[in-house]
Amino acid sequence: MAETPKERVVRYLQDAHAAATGADQAIEGYIDDTSDPAIKAVFSQNRTSTQAEAQRIEARLRALGEEPSGGKGFLNMIMAKVSELMHGAHDEYDKNTQNIIKAYALSHLERGMYQSLYSYSSAIGDAETAALAQTLQGENEAAAARLFPLIDTYAKTALAGTAGTGVAYTA
């Protein structure tokens, strides 16, 4: 039997909730992975926002008479694969840069997920879910914008690991 529009929006919300809780766990790992107070502060801010996302999604599910699924969603599977691919950090400098890249990618994945939720919920006339999705999409866009310049900054910190060693890069 095919899903009703409400069942589908509930499934999308459950997937979004699973993604937000998975993102929270990933960001907690990024915080634990670094000793850099500036990165810890940025990731802590992202984590607070992500936890608030999960709470708002859960509240919307409850308003629809449903509960979070507790399962792992599509986004969690993608982030697990991204982590596997980028697990080769050789030192603290690489680890910081890679974790910033992963957090940036995560923000964009969530942004796309919320755009899909917005489009679908708008099409079925669920204005409350659409408004929530649009808000969350904007918050993830802002998070990505905060993270992007840090990629450049922290990629360059790897120079500190080779500074003074007499090794010069020549192209």
Q: What would you call each of these model-derived segments?
A:
Residues 1-171:
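Amphipathic alpha-helical hairpins
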